[in-house]
Amino acid sequence: QLQVEDDDKIGLYSYKVQSTITSRLANTMIQAKMVNNAKRSQHIVFDVQVPKGAFIDNFTMDVNGISFTSKIREKSEARKMYSQAKAKGKAAGIVRSNALDMENFKTEVNVPPGTRIQFELHYHEMIRRKLSSYEHVISVKPGRLAKHMEVDVRIIEPQGLRYVHVPNSFGDHFDGITTISKGEKKAHVSFKPTMAQQRKCPTCSSTAVDGNFVVQYDVNRETTGGELEIFNGYFIHFFAPENLDPLPKNILFVIDVSGSMWGLKMKQTIEAMKAILSELRAADQFSLIDFNHNVRCWRDNLVSATPAQVEDAKKYIQTIHPNGGTNINEALLRATFILNEAQNLGMLDPNSVSMIVLVSDGDPTVGELKLTTIQKNVKQSIKDEFSLFCLGIGFDVDYDFLQRIATDNRGMAQRIFGNQETSAQMKNFYNQVSTPLLKKIQFNYPQESVSDVTQSSFHNYFGGSEIVVAGKVDTENLQHLESIVTATAANAELVMETLRDVEELDGFMKKDRYADPDFTRKLWAYLTVNQMLAERNTAPTAALKRNITKSILQMSLDHHIVTPFTAMLIENAEKDEIMLADQPKDPRRGCCPGTLGLTPNAPNNNKGIPAWANVTAVPVSFMPEQRSPPVSSLSINR
């Protein structure tokens, strides 16, 4: 979004977005070129929305040929340099990410008449698979008509593309303007509306381009054990098996019915819950808990999801009337008690998956109020036996707490905006976790050949998602990399093997001028930093937290990315004008569920399985791979 004092006198002569996805790694550049045609100085705001979780890695600015470039520094060092520049009377400004969701990069510049200015922001992210699709979302909000407008997205996927789809997110106004060119492993998406096409109406001076440009796609999957991609000393293992029977699930819905849920939020929650209950499978077991200052159970134990029980649960949900306070601690402990009791009594299928889904819109006001104590109580009660998923409705809830408690218990959290879309958002989240296909997934690699492997042990795999593991690999002394994945399916203990030539991708990558030759390193760093951020969030001691912080800082500096512990200094060549870009201290960012780090290898006696593979159960089904070879403000007065 470009904001100025006098809209009519600022010309936007170019607004360009270029994004290249190489094996799920999206590098995005947003560039705006403007000129101040007014007879006085103008205040220009460059405000760009960046996807939550993306890493900003570069920002440059050019003002009448004067270039400003960026570098990453440790946060306190960067702030010190910024303060020194400001104290000496040098031009200085602050660029801050939005403290709420970390989604905005914003700089404000005061430019004299006739000035030409160019902003350019670069960031990268890993595109995660949800509901059987990768969705790349780019915020395109130029704020005004642009003489040249372009959104250009290229997709390079060595696995091959199943489909590419661009929903009409800007509305019918832009029907037929987006072009899609799709090959076997590459695709090109282009959106180039003329100035006339950008107008809201033929005589309007405002732009209709205001929203998210979305590209959806999926890749081909020929192997059960996943896809290994090896390049430039790193490997990435993409794992998304299909055509498996769902595991039965034992699910407890814990719903906040305190007074703050009154009105639209409760109405939408009831609507969502009725739809979710209808989707339970016959093999599932479930119950409902609603809580305010008191805790009530629809059933004191799990019941089978028969049509009669589901219908009765819907009627119960319909009778809820929000009032009173919020006793989160008691509600979660009651839920864990029901699941633990069912397990102790042998009522749960050994191959089933147990989970709690908490829906709340506020902090505790009754019972235990200390968040760290609630987190400790829930952790001790769950005992790593099942998963906790948290939905935080609106902005009064402490979303950071929900993320900590979910991550600590093999789950994840999501913010739900308390509006007319609440029901759809809740159903969308449930659909992501409604179909567990595997449990106890363990990735194994030869220890003498790999190092610095990211999280390799996962509690569950849900249909439509994808598990990604990365690490460093010694390609100098290795011709092939082998992986063995073990997991529990509905009817078998699986052992899945994958073997890849370490040079298999070399030719493909060198032939494509758009592919990022650094994609494996960036994906490994992205996963590693996010994993450490999650690990730090739940670190039990201050000493461990400090050590993790040091590691995150070093990774951030090594890979030139803005994280909670680094800042971006933006300055001109003479170093007499400086800006500081940083993030708030505590990021509200979720990460990787499950155990962090490599699980120590256990001895195994399975014939045909390498000694380094951590296979503790005798395989019922051995599935080898089947594959044919192949700124507050910055004032500039010049």
List PLM regions with ranges:
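An acidic, Ser/Thr-enriched
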Residues: N58-D101, N110-V111, E120-V254, Q420, ...
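VWA/integrin I-like adhesion module and closely mimicked acidic/polar interface patches used
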Residues: G362-D408, M412-I416, E421-N428
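N-terminal, polar/Ser/Thr-rich
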Residues: Q1-R24, N614
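Asparagine-centered strand-capping/turn motif at beta-strand->loop junctions
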Residues: K33-R40, V48-V50
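Short, solvent-exposed beta-strand/turn "edge" segments of beta-rich domains on protein surfaces
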Residues: V17-N27, M34-N36, V109-R116, H459-F462
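Exported/extracytosolic protein signature
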Residues: L25-T28, N37-I44, I56-N58
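Short, solvent-exposed loop/turn segments enriched in Ser/Thr/Gly
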Residues: A26-I30, V353, L481, T549
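Von Willebrand factor
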Residues: N243-S304, N329-T336, L348-S360, P364, ...
